[in-house]
Regions:
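Non-heme di-metal
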Residues: 1-177
Length: 177
């Protein structure tokens, strides 16, 4: 596996809060999902789709309230939320969560939406740093997943049709692709 120890070092209290929050969520995911990388990806993408939507909505409301242009941020943030949603739709096809797992995922998303919105309202810097640390954790998790696929500990499988269509992949692409 590649060296994944490089990450943004916390500079201040806001960064330390963001890193601690991210590490706590990673700890919870590790307890629940261990080596079930498909399920971990579903939760990761469920959570990853939230920040762009929340930030886009709050900037939209601020733009309306102040009657000022958003300088294109709403569109960028909502496009990011949509991209993360497509990752989620892909991994739902891979992991095939049970109804109970879906309920847990929806509950986690609901709680995270509220928590992230509160954090964003109090400190946009902390909220954006959380997203940065989430991306670091995503790289770590997906690198582990890819390592499991490449070593054969997890069987590779055909890429879901939704992924092939969304990312214009060749017809016979696999999960590794």
């Amino acid at each position: 596996m590649q060296n994944l120890n490089n990450h943004y070092k916390p500079d201040n209290m806001s960064d330390r809060i963001a890193l601690s929050f991210t590490k706590f969520l990673r700890f919870v995911a590790d307890i629940f999902f261990k080596k079930k990388y498909g399920h971990r990806a579903v939760v990761l993408e469920t959570i990853a789709a939230v920040p762009g939507m929340v930030a886009g909505m709050l900037i939209h409301l601020k733009s309306l309230r102040k009657m000022e242009d958003d300088k294109g941020w709403i569109k960028i943030l909502l496009e990011e939320a949509e991209n993360e949603r497509m990752h989620l739709m892909t991994f739902i096809q891979v992991a095939k969560p049970t109804p109970i797992e879906r309920f847990i995922i929806i509950s986690a998303q609901f709680i995270f939406i509220i928590m992230y919105a509160i954090i964003y309202l109090f400190s946009q810097r902390t909220a954006h740093r959380i997203v940065g640390y989430f991306e670091e954790e995503a790289v770590f998790s997906y690198t582990e997943y890819l390592d499991e696929l490449e070593t054969g500990r997890i069987k590779d499988q055909p890429a879901p049709k939704i992924a092939i269509d969304y990312w214009n992949l060749p017809l016979h692409s696999t999960l590794k692709d």
